[in-house]
Amino acid sequence: MALRNVPFRSEVLGWDPDSLADYFKKLNYKDCEKAVKKYHIDGARFLNLTENDIQKFPKLRVPILSKLSQEINKNEERRSIFTRKPQVPRFPEETESHEEDNGGWSSFEEDDYESPNDDQDGEDDGDYESPNEEEEAPVEDDADYEPPPSNDEEALQNSILPAKPFPNSNSMYIDRPPSGKTPQQPPVPPQRPMAALPPPPAGRNHSPLPPPQTNHEEPSRSRNHKTAKLPAPSIDRSTKPPLDRSLAPFDREPFTLGKKPPFSDKPSIPAGRSLGEHLPKIQKPPLPPTTERHERSSPLPGKKPPVPKHGWGPDRRENDEDDVHQRPLPQPALLPMSSNTFPSRSTKPSPMNPLPSSHMPGAFSESNSSFPQSASLPPYFSQGPSNRPPIRAEGRNFPLPLPNKPRPPSPAEEENSLNEEWYVSYITRPEAEAALRKINQDGTFLVRDSSKKTTTNPYVLMVLYKDKVYNIQIRYQKESQVYLLGTGLRGKEDFLSVSDIIDYFRKMPLLLIDGKNRGSRYQCTLTHAAGYP
């Protein structure tokens, strides 16, 4: 749609539903006109359409309406450019042209891109001519910084006077005209590392040169770069070479001193190990007392618990696997218990054996089996299998639901378990209906044999409700050995027996579907049994 046919956004925001409906009427959008009047959509709501508002309009008009709202919003954005023009009126001709633009649609398009350019040219001529001329004047003179162009004479004086020393001094900083000494200071810092070399030797050997002594911290950094900076100062270098040679050994000495402590530490480590190795040799001859004393002293140092392990190794070198299992056990604070098991080989500490055996039954089964004194372990293991059978019995209780599934093994066995109160084996359909109508109450039911009498369709449930008899098939699935009620398309309940079906629908309502009238949906519970008394 052309912009000349689109109203301004500011106008549309002030529309009420009636004016918006009139606009759609002009566009020949009658269906949109009805929607606007029906849902009371005003102009502001139309410009900010939400998903709910869009759904209220016809689907065919939705893309057109969304595009229309976007164009109206864009129209206002373009209009906003021209509203700012009268704020800075330069010429009376431009103001008149803007008033004409506000009046007609065609002039809006014609002046879309012409008038702003004209205004910019005018503004450039009026606003930016004088500062440019003022800037060019000092640039032609000396091309240096000047204060703001408040007075031309003062600006020329301030710019000419500091401008002369700058090119002569070759300074990097142009923004500091008032002080002529400041440009000389910035080149000094690059010279400081060059001048920093003489002050430390001068401070050590010669007392003159107090000003450069402020940089005593920098010589440490510049020592690494002395070779590259030697040729620059020729006067002070005569004193430096001997100082550098003397400084080199001082620098080497701390490195040698730093290397000496690790050498002194290393012999201390094997010394500690040698002590640990000699300890088990002293403790080996008396087995029971030394091991107990060693364990009491072992918690004090952190490296001694592995030492008794090396003492145990020669005693049990034949069985490496036992050592692997026994070594991790004494580590977690069970050392006194594990130490008592080894002296069990001797006949003296017999009363101490039952304690470790009760706490650690499976750790030293070999040692316990070889000695009769550990008689407390066999009863423990004998009690284990006695306790295990009930655990197995509990495991056998888990598959107990399995025998529940074969409860309906076959329809033949199911017939014997059916209740004669509601089951009649040999009866025709008319006879069954007659039996139901004798009671003639809603919810009267009975189960009879199916006319087909197959394994998949063994029985039929007949229900009387509102003077109508409903016949519902009872199906049997061999694979899952369950009974299903109905065709299986709607019902998902499966039952283990026919009696379960009857008991369930005596409590829960049964859905009754008429084959002739599918729309009728009745529900009733099974209340009155119509079997033989």
UniProtKB/Swiss-Prot annotation:
Phosphotyrosine: residues bearing it: 23
Reported modifications of this chain: Phosphorylated after T-cell receptor activation by ZAP70, ITK and TXK, which leads to the up-regulation of Th1 preferred cytokine IL-2. SYK-dependent phosphorylation is required for recruitment of PI3K signaling components.
Range of residues in the leader sequence: none
GO cellular component terms, semicolon-separated: cell-cell junction; cytosol; plasma membrane raft; TCR signalosome
Primary role: Adapter protein primarily involved in signaling pathways within T-cells, as well as other immune cells such as platelets, mast cells, and natural killer (NK) cells. Plays a crucial role for transducing signal from the T-cell receptor (TCR) after antigen recognition leading to T-cell activation. Mechanistically, once phosphorylated by the kinase ZAP70, mediates interactions with the guanine-nucleotide exchange factor VAV1, the adapter protein NCK and the kinase ITK.
Composition bias type Pro residues, residue spans: 184-213, 400-411
Protein name, entry field: Lymphocyte cytosolic protein 2
Quaternary structure, from the entry: Interacts with SLA. Interacts with CBLB. Interacts with GRB2. Interacts with SHB. Interacts with PRAM1. Interacts (via SH2 domain) with CD6 (via tyrosine phosphorylated C-terminus). Interacts with FYB1 and the phosphorylated form of FYB2. Interacts with 14-3-3 adapter/YWHAZ; this phosphorylation leads to YWHAZ proteolytic degradation. Interacts with VAV1; this interaction plays a role in TCR-mediated cytokine production. Interacts with AGER; this interaction plays an important role in AGER-mediated pro-inflammatory responses and cytokine release.
Organism encoding this protein: Homo sapiens
Illness the protein is tied to: Immunodeficiency 81: An autosomal recessive disorder characterized by recurrent infections, including fungal infections, associated with T cell, neutrophil, and NK cell dysfunction. B cells may also show maturation abnormalities. Other features include autoimmune hemolytic anemia and abnormal platelet aggregation.
Tissues where the protein occurs: Highly expressed in spleen, thymus and peripheral blood leukocytes. Highly expressed also in T-cell and monocytic cell lines, expressed at lower level in B-cell lines. Not detected in fibroblast or neuroblastoma cell lines.
GO biological process: cell surface receptor protein tyrosine kinase signaling pathway; immune response; intracellular signal transduction; mast cell activation; positive regulation of protein kinase activity; T cell receptor signaling pathway
